[in-house]
Amino acid sequence: MKTIIVFLSLLVLATKFGDANEGVNQEQMKEVIQNEFREDFLNEMAAMSLLQQLEAIESTLLEKEADRNSRQKRCLGENVPCGDFPCCGKLVCQKTFGYGWLYKSPYCVKPSNG
């Protein structure tokens, strides 16, 4: 009988202190969950900030690439029939003796020095 009383008293004490620890555990779990949500929120905010920075860098690079890809109008090289299109660089659109008599159109040639 004495052993049953001892075990019952231990059961009551364990239940009482177990409930107290459970309340503490619940508070600790709430704190842990809140900290995790804060960390997740901060990580998400950092990721969003990083994403915005990357988008800004990407837009500047795309602008530079668009500027680089925009080129002058196409031009014609040396000994190519010209007319509607301009000749490149220092070439001039002239009727020449060599090709002009055959095709009856001017050609892009280097300007003569004289």
Swiss-Prot record:
It is found in: Secreted. It comes from the Eukaryota. Expressed by the venom gland. Residues 21-74 form a propeptide. Keywords: Cleavage on pair of basic residues, Disulfide bond, Ion channel impairing toxin, Knottin, Secreted, Signal, Toxin. GO terms for cellular component: extracellular region. Its main location: secreted. Disulfide bonds join 75-88, 82-93, 87-108. Ion channel inhibitor. Belongs to the neurotoxin 14 (magi-1) family. 03 (ICK-30-40) subfamily. The presence of a 'disulfide through disulfide knot' structurally defines this protein as a knottin. This is U17-barytoxin-Tl1a.
